[in-house]
Structure formats: C-alpha cells, structure tokens
Amino acid sequence: MSRNGLGPVAGVDEAGRGACCGPISIAACILPDKPIQELAALTDSKNLSASTREKLMPLIKKHALAWSVIVISAQDIDRFGIQHANISGMRRAVAALDTQPGYVLTDAMKVPGFTVPYLPIIGGDASARCIAAASVLAKQTRDDIMTDMANDYPHYGLEIHKGYSTKIHMDAVRHHGASPEHRYSYANVAKAHQEWLHAADNDTTEGGA
C-alpha cells in the first residue's frame, strides 16, 4: 500500500473486549515496509506465548515508525458500552500516533470516523504485520495491567485469566462480590454480584434472627 501512495499504513487492534473485568486496550502501530528479522515471530498475539509477547513488545517499540496504546477503563465501558469504547479507542489510538498514517488496517472491525481510508481485514492480526504488532502491544499492555490489578484484588485470580469469564473467576465473584474494576453492565457480572448480595442478605438475616 505504501508503494501505491497510500502509506504509511497503520495497524489497529484491541485486547480485552471479551473480558468482564478490567479495561480494554487498543493499540496502533506503523512498521517499516522492509522485513525486520527481530520481528520475524510476529503474528496474532493470541497465538503467541506470554514469554514471546514480552520479548516482542520492546522490539516492536524499537522498530516501529510510530505506535500508541489507549486504555479505556471498565467504568467507561459500563458508561458508554463496549462497542463505543472499542470504536472511540481505535480512533484515539490512530490520532495519538506521532506519524499520521495515510491508510489504516483493522482486524475485521468497522470503525467510522477515521480521517483517512481504512480496510477491515478478517484475520488481519495473523496476516498483516502492522495489525499483529498492534495486537501484541494491546494484549501485553492489558496483561500487565491485569497482573498489577491482581495485587489490589487478590480474590479473583486476575493474574491467571486476565479478567475473562472463567468458572474460577465467576465463582469468586459469587463468593466475594464484584470489584470496582468489574464491568457491571455485563450480564454475567451483574448476575454473580447479585447472587453475592443475596447470600450476604441471607447471612445478615439469619445472624439477626
């Protein structure tokens, strides 16, 4: 695309859309056109081990012509909705690039409001290097946030499942209630938190009987 006068090309991707706790992170990245040996392992971040992502993240930042990461809190997700958070985050991530792109590639996501042409590519994080780089930046940033968050909220195992809806996670919400970092607009969180409230009310009633 750069050779066709549409460059530089930015890739955009998100991490955490399907989680029920913690933020969503959205990254944008512009890579040089030439192959980069240190980034040969780049592919969809979901197909990379945690250790590989950790190694790639500083290398992506080192070689990228420009990169940015936007983090949108669980509170804003509850307030505006995940779709709005995702789309606005992608626009903000592209706008935050030091070098403005002439074209944007997304991982199958339609994003109205870009100031330049864009193309959603199905499976783009596995086929376009700039999207793959963005996916690593987004996921590793979010994983680091969730690992730190586990220190503040140790009951949920956030360092393990990173806020996704595993059985262990939902059982913990039923037992301890949801934390301030949970997405209360998500039905599974609301239901589990309500079950905790109901159990707490029953315990109070029985204790006062």
From Swiss-Prot:
It comes from the Bacteria. GO terms for cellular component: cytoplasm; ribonuclease H2 complex. Its EC number is 3.1.26.4. It is found in: Cytoplasm. Keywords: Cytoplasm, Endonuclease, Hydrolase, Manganese, Metal-binding, Nuclease. It catalyses: Endonucleolytic cleavage to 5'-phosphomonoester. Transmembrane segments: none annotated. One of its GO terms (molecular function) is RNA-DNA hybrid ribonuclease activity. The keyword Manganese applies. The keyword Manganese applies. Endonuclease that specifically degrades the RNA of RNA-DNA hybrids. Belongs to the RNase HII family. NCBIfam families: PRK00015.1-3, PRK00015.2-2. This is Ribonuclease HII. It comes from Corynebacterium glutamicum (strain R).
